[in-house]
Amino acid sequence: MINLIGKKTQIACGLLCCCSMAYAQSNDNSEVVVLNAGWEFSQAGTELWRPAQVPGTVHQDLIYHKQIPDPFYGINEQKIQWVENEDWEYRTAFTVTPEQLKRDDAQLVFEGLDTYADVYLNGALLLKADNMFVGYTIPVKSQLRLGENLLHIYFHSPIRQTMPQYNSNGFNYPADNDHHEKHVSVFSRKAPYSYGWDWGIRMVTSGIWRPVTIRYYDAASISDYHVKQLSLTDQLAKLSNELEINNILPQ
């Protein structure tokens, strides 16, 4: 990992926009493959798999397959509370070509997992996620194989996952939005509104709520960048630039 801090420069604000756009584009030395198709989901412990929508949530998939009623109609909110106490699994398969396998490195990128998720690639555990607000980037070059690759995600019930913390705490935190008598919402890095609010129902869900990609590249890649405005006038903006680069070549 190399940190490169660019020299302070004076540039027009328009150039900053161009740099941001270029950062998201591919070139001859890299390839980005979106893995949002071909997903299936299942209630853990069963062998019944159904097509899933990614990005999405398990409630969304259950509604589509008519396994739960519309939770926003009447008192149907009460009929869907069982979902939050179950574990759920998602899986898909994707193909790796000889050209992709020859790349110097590959990264599996999850922009958002909600919330307690074990990620497996070809049977190997790669990640145990516990925060829906952050993305995860996983090096997967050594796990990839030519042809079909299997990606499997096991989502743990956010209720059962945090209940031990609640039970050992000895008291209820004042989370008035939480529509349950046991306020386990305070123990999760998860959107509080899913546990209920004065304007919304309780629907504690799980799922792949943001896109999934696999990124192939040669030599190096920009993993992060930060632009800080130092000063601003009507004529010029003075900026400092910092790049974080993954460099896999020998130093």
Language model segments and positions:
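Bacterial N-terminal signal peptides that target proteins for export
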Residues: 1-12
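Bacterial N-terminal signal peptides
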Residues: 12-20
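Accessory beta-strand-rich segments of carbohydrate-active enzymes
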Residues: 26-27, 31, 42, 85-221, ...
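Mature N-terminal segment immediately following signal peptide/propeptide cleavage
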Residues: 30-44, 49-56
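N-terminal, polar/Ser/Thr-rich
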Residues: 46-51, 55-70, 184, 200-204, ...
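Surface-exposed, low-complexity/disordered Ser/Thr/Gly/Pro/Asn-rich loops and linkers
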Residues: 70-81
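Beta-strand-rich binding/interaction modules
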Residues: 119-121, 236-251
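Short, solvent-exposed loop/linker segments at the N-terminal edge
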Residues: 229-237
